[in-house]
């Protein structure tokens, strides 16, 4: 069974998002073992100088990096990432599984993004959309997409 970890910066505060994520975790049970792990976001003053923002991003990246398992296929969500269709991403996951890579980690950065040191470690930079979303909403969007990918992989109705 495929193991998927979702690493996030910051605590999920909105109840409606938590309920949606919980629903997708339940739906994914037959397909993959999915766990979500949060690291605390670092305080960053509004309108902070670039150097301060870089320090904050690096501190968050260091916390995330400690949670990475050796050998995991690392997908970093990034606005500058590659845009793939749901079908293409499902195919990518299926290809990884067939080649023996059954451990995937997705990273969702905080409100000021991720440090380059972490982005550079990615096996895949993935953009879910050209639109900008709050990082907490991205968790729910990612969960829905992961569920959709597995429905596509198993040729089950849902994604049409």
Curated annotation (Swiss-Prot):
Pfam families named among the record's database cross-references: SPOUT_MTase
Subcellular location: Cytoplasm
Residues that coordinate or bind S-adenosyl-L-methionine: 77, 109, 128-133
Listed EC numbers: 2.1.1.177
InterPro entries (alphabetical): Alpha/beta_knot_MTases (IPR029028), RlmH-like (IPR003742), tRNA_m1G_MTases_N (IPR029026)
Keywords from the named record: Cytoplasm, Methyltransferase, rRNA processing, S-adenosyl-L-methionine, Transferase
Keyword field contains Methyltransferase: yes
Listed Gene3D superfamilies: 3.40.1280.10
Molecular function per GO: rRNA (pseudouridine-N3-)-methyltransferase activity
Key word Transcription present: no
Tree of life domain: Bacteria
Reaction it catalyzes: pseudouridine(1915) in 23S rRNA + S-adenosyl-L-methionine = N(3)-methylpseudouridine(1915) in 23S rRNA + S-adenosyl-L-homocysteine + H(+)
CC terms in the record's Gene Ontology section: cytoplasm
Family statement drawn from the similarity comment of this UniProt entry: Belongs to the RNA methyltransferase RlmH family.
Function statement: Specifically methylates the pseudouridine at position 1915 (m3Psi1915) in 23S rRNA.
HAMAP family from the UniProt entry: 23SrRNA_methyltr_H
Assembly: Homodimer.
Protein name: Ribosomal RNA large subunit methyltransferase H
């Amino acid at each position: 069974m495929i193991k998927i970890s979702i690493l996030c910066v910051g605590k999920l505060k909105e109840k409606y998002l938590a309920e949606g994520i919980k629903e997708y975790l339940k739906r994914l049970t037959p397909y993959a073992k999915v766990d979500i792990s949060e690291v605390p976001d670092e305080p960053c003053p509004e309108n902070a100088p670039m150097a301060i923002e870089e320090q904050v991003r690096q501190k968050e990246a260091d916390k995330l990096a400690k949670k990475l398992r050796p050998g995991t296929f690392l997908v970093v969500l990034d606005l500058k990432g590659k845009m793939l269709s749901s079908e293409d991403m499902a195919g990518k996951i299926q290809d990884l599984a067939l080649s023996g890579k059954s451990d995937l980690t997705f990273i969702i950065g905080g409100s000021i993004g991720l440090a380059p040191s972490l982005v550079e470690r990615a096996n895949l930079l993935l953009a879910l959309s050209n639109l900008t979303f709050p990082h907490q909403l991205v968790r729910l969007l990612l969960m829905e997409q992961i569920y959709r990918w597995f429905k596509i992989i198993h040729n089950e109705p849902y994604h049409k």
